[in-house]
Amino acid sequence: MKRDLHQFQGPNHGTSIAGSSTSSPAVFGKDKMMMVKEEEDDELLGVLGYKVRSSEMAEVALKLEQLETMMGNAQEDGLAHLATDTVHYNPAELYSWLDNMLTELNPPAATTGSNALNPEINNNNNNNSFFTGGDLKAIPGNAVCRRSNQFAFAVDSSSNKRLKPSSSPDSMVTSPSPAGVIGTTVTTVTESTRPLILVDSQDNGVRLVHALMACAEAVQSSNLTLAEALVKQIGFLAVSQAGAMRKVATYFAEALARRIYRLSPPQTQIDHSLSDTLQMHFYETCPYLKFAHFTANQAILEAFEGKKRVHVIDFSMNQGLQWPALMQALALREGGPPSFRLTGIGPPAADNSDHLHEVGCKLAQLAEAIHVEFEYRGFVANSLADLDASMLELRPSETEAVAVNSVFELHKLLGRTGGIEKVFGVVKQIKPVIFTVVEQESNHNGPVFLDRFTESLHYYSTLFDSLEGAPSSQDKVMSEVYLGKQICNLVACEGPDRVERHETLSQWSNRFGSSGFAPAHLGSNAFKQASTLLALFNGGEGYRVEENNGCLMLSWHTRPLITTSAWKLSAVH
């Protein structure tokens, strides 16, 4: 809103306080700041792929006003060719795109002169205060529709149009109507189809990826001003996408924003409890956790062959979803089931309840029903690095065979100095017949933020793409939230707070080898049965099981996503 003139006048009401010389230092400094701001805006527009300068935005806004007015007043016949014959592929070149659109429309009422349709705009063409940043839209149109491989931006010609007033308070912009009605609003009464301006979806997708990468690069170089501007544009560009791309971009945008504004996600007991619940939904939606449990159980079952007393120490107890299948397999074992002891380790509950005990009670009921001798004990630990072998009530290996199991847990130790070495030391004291490990197949633990960001963007884009084939349900939505929390931790956090430090099989193999473990190859039965399991999900389409040096990898198309490996103490130990 304009201030009254007397607010800027001195006591004599005739001399301006700040207006005696245009070459004063204050004015010069203001001009310099404006030039720097324009350069920053030009940089941002260039990064996003728009071939236009900030100084040209006023004229672009003028053309957008003309285009909106023409489309609002054109008849159905005058726009039909846009919906059928004309496709505009590159709105990044705003000048040529707008000129092309204005030429294609060519309304019958148009006269010579670029602003003949709206003479009020001509009268105020040099008044840049008429145009503000809020008047501009990166992509024109009021609605977004998905059509094959393109995005269709629809303009509803049957809706009411309100044209902006000029800078003069007494002049109103009007549009001619068949009834000759003059006023601030014009209502189109003709019924028409929605004419479409089609934009290549790949163009928008590429621009979105470029914006994500540019923002991550700005964060790494500590250019937070540019990063802040880019993260806002990422959210805007993401809504023009559909499916997995929109969801992934939204989660990465949130994570980048948290890093920029130093709003680290919480790492509390409530957060642990929520992650546990979300993991259950993830288990129901897609085959990744089922594959992890099945392949690990198969390796444990083979290692327990012929043993009368067996003991599993689970580093990732959670809701105990892995163990009913193993207990049923033991119950069906030739010669009768062995005595089965289970030690479950998990984080503390938010309400201080003994949730591990509740899980044990449910498993005990199952064991009784299938006639398996069962013993259970749960341990609460904030970190696996807090464990000590003496807590586990180990029995002589001659009387009891022990297996250690870890699913998506070991990578959380890599941010704690000496954490993984401490756990490996405890496992060697346990002397298990097998140590089964499931981890994400990706390197998200490098020292360079931009490299981690790039790898995680590829990895989670593939994961979200695999979820698109699942039926829409609450489980699917919660599964996406589960993955989104991982993205947030990976991108927004550093130091001990960043626990999502995934590494590849080759990296883990080096760690295990240097710590005194040797690989225990998974059998062919696990490979065949895992392939059968995947057929239950989307007909198995897209999922692949691959064998890699005795380990099993679950891939979506050609990208490995998780790996199951098994280890035993090397001969020298």
From Swiss-Prot:
Gene Ontology annotations of biological process type: gibberellic acid mediated signaling pathway; hyperosmotic salinity response; jasmonic acid mediated signaling pathway; negative regulation of gibberellic acid mediated signaling pathway; negative regulation of seed germination; regulation of DNA-templated transcription; regulation of reactive oxygen species metabolic process; regulation of seed dormancy process
PTM text: Phosphorylated. Ubiquitinated. Upon GA application it is ubiquitinated, leading to its subsequent degradation.
Gene3D superfamilies, per this entry? Transcriptional regulator DELLA, N-terminal domain
Q: Where is this region: PFYRE?
A: 402-489
Q: Where is this region: Disordered?
A: 1-25, 158-179
GRAS domain sequence ranges: 199-568
Question: Region VHIID: which residues?
Answer: 279-344
Q: Which GO terms describe its molecular function?
A: DNA-binding transcription factor activity; sequence-specific DNA binding
Q: Annotated region Leucine repeat I (LRI): where?
A: 206-260
Q: Which GO terms describe its cellular component?
A: nucleus
Q: Does the keyword Transcription regulation apply?
A: yes
Compositionally biased intervals (Polar residues): 9-25
Sequence motif: DELLA motif, positions:
42-46
Motif VHIID: where? 310-314
Q: Where is this region: Leucine repeat II (LRII)?
A: 358-390
Q: Where in this protein would one find the motif LXXLL motif, according to its record?
A: 410-414
Q: Where in the cell is it found?
A: Nucleus
Instruction: Show the segment(s) annotated as SAW.
Output: 492-568
Question: Where is it chiefly localized?
Answer: nucleus
* Record keywords: Gibberellin signaling pathway, Nucleus, Phosphoprotein, Repressor, Transcription, Transcription regulation, Ubl conjugation
The record ties this protein, via InterPro entries, to: DELLA_N_sf, TF_DELLA_N, TF_GRAS
Q: What is known of its domains?
A: The DELLA motif is required for its GA-induced degradation.
> Which family is this sequence assigned to?
Belongs to the GRAS family. DELLA subfamily.
Biological function: Probable transcriptional regulator that acts as a repressor of the gibberellin (GA) signaling pathway. Probably acts by participating in large multiprotein complexes that repress transcription of GA-inducible genes. Upon GA application, it is degraded by the proteasome, allowing the GA signaling pathway.
Listed name of the protein:
DELLA protein RGA1
Which gene carries the instructions for this protein? RGA1
